[in-house]
Amino acid sequence: MISTPEPLHAGHILTPFCCGVDSIDNWLEQRAMKNQTTGASRTFVCCGSDSNVLAYYSLASSAVTTNTSPGRFRRNMPDPIPVVVLGRLAVDKSLHGQGVARALVRDAGLRVIQVAETIGIRGMLVHALSDEAREFYQRVGFVPSPMDPMMLMVTLGDLVESV
């Protein structure tokens, strides 16, 4: 059984999390709690019954220039465009192929929609680390940047429609 996403705290066990990508595994262990404490990003984790992290994602605020954004994303927007960055998203190898990543994107989308009721946000942005990740994000509604196909975005309106 896996828990619903909750904010990372000191009681969570970060090792032996292994998604198969060293940089993402290492970020969870070495940076996630520091960023949580300083406010640089917020990490949300799903755990097993023993508080071991089995999946996670992080969110941070940012902005993108209009020339790096797809047409619908930049239409009628200031430069730069306010966004939330889906900074990391990973699922332990033991849960690959079970829809957990898609559920994490949905949860992140719901949080972004909630935040957008308080502050101005155009949508969510992600930097895919591989072609496989890029294809996944495109399947869940993200559109690639015209300047960088590994940077993908989804508008707030599309998030609302998809969740």
From Swiss-Prot:
Q: What happens when the gene is disrupted?
A: Deleting the operon causes 90% reduction in persister cell formation in mouse bone marrow-derived macrophages. All 3 tacA-tacT operons can be deleted without an effect on growth in cell culture.
Induction remark:
The tacA2-tacT2 operon is up-regulated about 15-fold in a relA-spoT-dependent manner within 30 minutes of phagocytosis by mouse bone marrow-derived macrophages.
Enzyme superclass (EC): transferase
Which Pfam families does this UniProt record tie to the protein? Acetyltransf_7 (PF13508)
**Catalysed reaction equations from the record:** glycyl-tRNA(Gly) + acetyl-CoA = N-acetylglycyl-tRNA(Gly) + CoA + H(+)
- Source taxon at top rank: Bacteria
Question: Which SUPFAM superfamilies does the UniProt record give?
Answer: Acyl-CoA N-acyltransferases (Nat)
Amino-acid positions noted as binding acetyl-CoA in the UniProt annotation, renumbered to this chain: L89, V91, H96, G97, Q98, G99, A101, R102, E132, R139
Q: Which residues form the active site?
A: Y137
- Which protein family is it in? Belongs to the acetyltransferase family. GNAT subfamily.
Name this protein carries in UniProt: tRNA-acetylating toxin 2
The record lists the lineage as: Bacteria, Pseudomonadati, Pseudomonadota, Gammaproteobacteria, Enterobacterales
